[in-house]
């Protein structure tokens, strides 16, 4: 399972399926906030559940690799605090502490592309088919908030069981899939951050390149 991003490939980035948490010192504060983040999620579910829509949908302005069963799939839905860099103030209003915590993290910031910060809901008995993400210059982070038994994630050849309050980061340019084999919903907080190996200059160059490509495509 090589790195196979479908938008941008950064050479010479180490191959890691799951990134060691010890290199991401903010993970500890993220896990410590599990209770308050779950409370805000429950507020969102009670007050604005309609914000959950299919994670991959027909009107999405991006290329999705191996989209197959992912497209317009009601069993995998999401409610965004930020989607492709754009804030959703209705969702944010339910989740002020989540917003505050996210703003303290090294989120990937690329105009029109990132960050994306969302609550990701996987229905009972559902699976997310194998797929790859856009960039290998970022990591996708999960904080499980409402997790029944029998939920898991595979990245490359590595599998992990999803457990409430146990966060991780992984390279989503590597083929990955998820499942919920229980009879309850699974909801996690999902967001993207820069890989720690990249310095500020490299991040700026990647940002400038991808913003320029997006601007060109929008004009043609």
Q: Predicted regions span which residues?
A:
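Fe(II)/2-oxoglutarate oxygenase catalytic core
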Residues: 1-118, 122-132, 148-151, 199-220
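Short glycine-rich loop/turn motifs
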Residues: 116, 138-141
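Short beta-strand His + acidic residue motifs that chelate non-heme Fe in jelly-roll/DSBH
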Residues: 128-131, 152-153, 170, 176-182
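Glycine-rich phosphate/pyrophosphate-binding beta-alpha loops
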Residues: 135
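A short hydrophobic beta-strand segment most commonly corresponding to one strand
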Residues: 140-144, 169, 184-199
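A short beta-strand-loop-beta hairpin characteristic of the jelly-roll/cupin
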Residues: 145-164
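Short Gly/Pro-enriched loop/turn and capping motifs at secondary-structure junctions
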Residues: 150, 175-177, 194-198
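Conserved metal-binding segment of the jelly-roll/cupin
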Residues: 161-175
């Amino acid at each position: 399972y090589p790195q196979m991003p479908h938008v941008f490939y950064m050479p010479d980035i180490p191959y890691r399926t799951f990134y060691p948490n010890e290199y991401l010192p903010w993970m500890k504060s993220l896990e410590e906030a599990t209770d308050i983040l779950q409370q805000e999620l429950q507020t969102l579910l009670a007050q604005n559940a309609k914000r959950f829509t299919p994670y991959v949908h027909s009107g999405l302005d991006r290329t999705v690799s191996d989209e197959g069963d992912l497209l317009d799939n009601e069993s995998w839905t999401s409610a965004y605090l930020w989607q492709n860099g754009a804030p959703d103030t209705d969702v944010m209003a339910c989740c002020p502490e989540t917003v505050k915590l996210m703003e303290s993290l090294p989120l990937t910031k690329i105009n029109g592309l990132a960050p994306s910060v969302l609550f990701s809901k996987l229905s009972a008995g559902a699976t997310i088919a194998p797929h790859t993400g856009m960039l290998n210059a970022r990591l996708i982070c999960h904080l499980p908030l409402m997790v029944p038994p029998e939920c898991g994630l595979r990245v490359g050849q590595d599998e992990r069981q999803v457990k409430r309050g146990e966060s991780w980061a992984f390279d989503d340019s590597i083929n990955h899939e998820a499942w919920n084999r229980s009879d309850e919903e699974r909801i996690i907080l999902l967001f993207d951050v820069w890989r720690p190996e990249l310095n500020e200059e490299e991040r700026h160059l990647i940002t400038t390149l991808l913003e320029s490509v997006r601007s060109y495509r929008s004009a043609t």
